[in-house]
Amino acid sequence: MSHVTTSQEMTEKSKEYFEKIVELTKKEGITLALISGPYLLEERDQEVYNSIGQLAEKDGLLFWNTNTPARYREMALDFSTDYADHAHLNEAGSAKYTAYLGKWLSKNYSFPDRRGQKGYESWENQLMKSGE
C-alpha cells in the first residue's frame, strides 16, 4: 500500500485518545514511539496511517510503519504462511515480527538490563518459558 499517498483522519474518538496519550507521555517525560504491526492493509488503513504519520511528525514523534513491501521483505513475512487471518500473524509470523521488532528497538533505544533484579522475576519466568 505504499502507493497510497492520500490521507484520511482517524475517527474523532481515536484522535481524542491519541491526543490524550501524546499529552500524557509528554507530561510524564516518556518517549512515545508509534509502531504499526504488520497486517493485510486495505487502502483506507494506509490513508489513516498516512494521517497518523503526519500527526506524529507535527508532534515530533516517531512513527514506524512496518506495513511496507520493504519491511515485509526484511521480516521475511509470507502472507500465505505467516498469517492466521487478514489481521493477525500466526505463531511463525509472530516470531518473525517479534525478532524484527526486538532488533529495531535494541538498535534505536537503550533499555536497562533487569535480569536478576527484584520485581522483575515474571520477566525471567516468561523468558524461560519461551526457551530463550
Predicted features and spans:
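Secreted/periplasmic serine-hydrolase-like ester/acetyl group-modifying domain
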Residues: 1-28, 116-132
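A short, structure-level motif marking secondary-structure boundaries and short turns
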Residues: 5-7, 36-38, 86-87
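Serine/threonine-rich low-complexity intrinsically disordered regions
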Residues: 6, 42, 78-82
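Acidic-and-aromatic substrate-binding clefts and catalytic sites of carbohydrate-active enzymes
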Residues: 9-14, 40-47
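Active-site segments of SGNH/GDSL-like serine hydrolases
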Residues: 19-45
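C-terminal regions of proteins
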Residues: 48-131
